[in-house]
Curated annotation (Swiss-Prot):
Higher taxonomy: Bacteria, Bacillati, Bacillota, Bacilli, Lactobacillales
GO biological process: phosphoenolpyruvate-dependent sugar phosphotransferase system
Organism: Lactococcus lactis subsp. lactis (strain IL1403)
Alphabetical UniProt keywords: Kinase, Phosphoprotein, Phosphotransferase system, Sugar transport, Transferase, Transport
Protein name as annotated: PTS system cellobiose-specific EIIB component
Positions carrying Phosphocysteine: C10
Gene from which the chain derives: ptcB
Gene Ontology MF term list: kinase activity; protein-N(PI)-phosphohistidine-sugar phosphotransferase activity
Length: 108
């Protein structure tokens, strides 16, 4: 079982799945055992409840769904899961290492 679970939520998932791959590589390169996955924003309630996938230790929203931050932040707080929006620059440049570092900062 992974040490930490990092969930990303986005609108559709294609570009976010590429970012997940880059985050997984950055974690592996640093000897970290993280489960990192992406799902649609429609799955946020299930993710926060740990239904259908492990409950995340942190939830990151893709910048294209940043407008949902207020609504999701309330749900995440109730679930005890820190969350934030991925920086547009890091998302656009697919900087998996930077997004991973942001997730780690939220978990600490």
């Amino acid at each position: 079982m992974a040490d930490k679970v990092i969930a990303l939520a986005c609108a559709a998932g294609m570009s976010t799945s590429l970012l997940v791959s880059k985050m997984q590589k950055a974690a592996a390169d640093n000897g970290k055992d993280y489960e990192i996955f992406a799902k649609s924003t429609a799955d946020i309630d299930n993710m926060l409840a740990g239904t259908g996938s492990p409950k995340p230790d942190v939830l990151l929203l893709g910048p294209q769904v940043a407008f949902m931050k207020g609504e999701v932040a309330k749900k995440a707080e109730i679930a005890g899961v820190p969350m934030d929006v991925i920086k547009m620059q890091d998302y656009g440049m697919m900087r998996g290492d930077k997004v991973l570092a942001a997730a780690e900062n939220l978990m600490n």
